[in-house]
Amino acid sequence: APSLVGSEMCIRDSFKKYQYLSFVMSKEILKKVRQIEIRTKNIVNDFFGGDYHSNFKGRGMTFSEVREYVPGDDVRSIDWNVTARTGKPHLKIFEEERELSVLILIDVSSSGVFGSKKNLKIDLGVEIAAMLSFSAIKNNDKVGLALFSDKVEKYIPPKKGKKHVLRLITDIVNHDFENSNKRTSIKTAIDFANKISKRKSVIFLISDFIDDNFWNELKFLNFKHDVIGLQIYDAYERNFPNLGIINIHDSETGENTWIDTTSKKIRDKFQKNSIEKLNSFSKKCKNIGFDLIQISTDDDYIKFLMQFFRSRANRS
């Protein structure tokens, strides 16, 4: 009996600790979600909303009503069948089908849990996803989310409203990014987007794009939908500093490599390879007509996005 009582007390204590830890974790998550909400909503309201709106204008025109012709109306819109039947000229009125469906695909593989300065790659990805989500609902669009690594880990179908967007952000923040050795499969994310997006949609693909086996699938997705890639890379990939002898861990393969960064020759080679990879990827995207934004973890991403969307609006 004493041992049973002791076990009960131990279980009760463990449960209380679990409840306390859950409460603390929930508070931390809510705090982080709130911080992201305040920052990204302010960006949307102050800078970004108009640029988003001018880029995404709905699926086209849809029939609204038939009404009598009044002087000044466009005669090309006359409905001759109704005009003949009533003996009075009537017009067919069309309205822009404004509502869009937006899907945000976020790479949550292990390579995103890296950051040499203030941001992890995934942290920047989450903030950009939140900003795009608030832009979508401000535009009266539906927005959905898919988290992927080498499989689709979570999918939330597109809906409207602030509560829905806060749920999206909470689910991203609450995701287990520390689970080691999650690999990247862009092809898996693209195949999933093709499968679930029946009507033309706006699709944002946020990743570091370390995987390179998806070009045919991307061409097809880009043909059917309005797809924009956001490639997030770390600041050290562009400008590698002298950090002494360091151990570099590949979070997707689990491999470790020692590098002597005191050698300028090694630093220059690393930097040259990284820049060549970024430039080569950008060129491939351009060749298939895929819109790409490349953003470093220490860049002012708001400025980059605004420049991109303004340039894109001028093209259309």
Regions found by a protein language model. Give the residues of each.
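Acidic beta-strand-to-loop metal/phosphate-binding motif
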Residues: 202-208
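Von Willebrand factor type A / integrin I
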Residues: 23-56, 65, 74, 192-199, ...
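An amphipathic, basic-hydrophobic helix/alpha-beta surface used to engage anionic
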Residues: 18, 22-156, 202
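Von Willebrand factor
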Residues: 164-201, 213-214, 234
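Residues immediately flanking
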Residues: 108, 209, 232
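Short beta->alpha connector loops
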Residues: 85-86, 209-213
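Single conserved hydrophobic/aromatic residue that forms the stacking wall/gate
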Residues: 1-13
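Hydrophobic/aromatic beta-strand patches that form the interior of the parallel beta-sheet core
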Residues: 103, 146, 204, 228-230, ...
